């Protein structure tokens, strides 16, 4: 895994015939942790680099009264009737999503739509999503953040909505915390959203103070090696460590 070149695009052939073209497409990269890593939730300074590997999401309004999320990587389609979609309780929505096949991965996409509709008072409409990702799953390179940022970017283009400053990564974090149920910090979403090719992104995680990107000297490269250890922010141990860090402030 190396630093990020141009982001990919992919065809929309897997979107259903009922979609109202044109749709919106957006991409976001994974990130390589160069310094700081898991200490983001304790307010530390971290250095992150965007990867070449990215996630691309295409979204389009459709006529069928449902949300549909197709993953080109697993070859599955998640569907949720609009009548079962509610934003008054993220926890209730999480249970509804997980009760359906594919809900474990589709929750990131549906969660982004939920927070955007709720926080920005947008009209809920039937949408079909198509997702393709090159970011390795469970390897600690922020595959979930890349999916969230790409989804929110696509939705903002679809709804013709502009989110200033760090609002987009904050909404992405809210989707992962509230709908997915993972107690992640904000670092991954910031890195995926604001990372610059061939640069390190310094972030002071208190919670989202961005410093100017640092260009890499010529000839210097960072390479990520797969340790074979699977990583999951949703794991119980992560939540326990984060809770312990907060207790240290009191």
Please annotate each region the language model reported.
Residues 183-187, 191-250:
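Acidic-enriched catalytic cores of C-N bond-cleaving enzymes acting on peptides and small amides
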Residues 2-145, 149, 153-166, 170-180, ...:
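ATP-binding N-lobe of GHMP and related small-molecule kinases
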């Amino acid at each position: 895994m190396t630093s990020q070149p141009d982001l990919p695009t992919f065809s929309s052939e897997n979107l259903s015939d009922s979609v109202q073209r044109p749709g919106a497409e957006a991409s976001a990269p994974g990130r390589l942790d160069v310094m700081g890593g898991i200490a983001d939730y304790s307010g530390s300074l971290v250095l992150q680099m965007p990867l070449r590997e990215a996630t691309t999401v295409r979204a389009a309004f459709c006529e069928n009264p449902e949300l549909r999320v197709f993953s080109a990587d697993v070859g599955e389609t998640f569907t949720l009737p609009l009548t079962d979609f509610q934003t008054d309780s993220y926890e209730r929505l999480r249970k509804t999503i997980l009760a359906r096949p594919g809900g474990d991965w589709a929750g990131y996409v549906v969660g982004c739509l939920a927070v955007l509709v709720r926080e920005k008072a947008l009209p809920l409409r039937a949408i079909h999503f198509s997702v393709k990702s090159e970011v390795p799953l469970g390897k600690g390179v922020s595959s979930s953040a890349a999916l969230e940022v790409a989804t929110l970017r696509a939705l903002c283009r679809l709804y013709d909505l502009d989110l200033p400053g760090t609002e987009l990564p904050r909404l992405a974090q809210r989707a992962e915390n509230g709908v997915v149920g993972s107690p992640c910090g904000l670092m991954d979403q910031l890195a995926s959203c604001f990372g610059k090719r061939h640069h390190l992104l310094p972030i002071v995680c208190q919670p989202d103070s961005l410093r100017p990107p640092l260009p890499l000297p010529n000839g210097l490269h960072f390479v990520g090696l797969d340790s074979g250890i699977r990583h999951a922010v949703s794991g119980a141990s992560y939540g326990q460590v984060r809770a312990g860090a907060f207790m240290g402030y009191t």
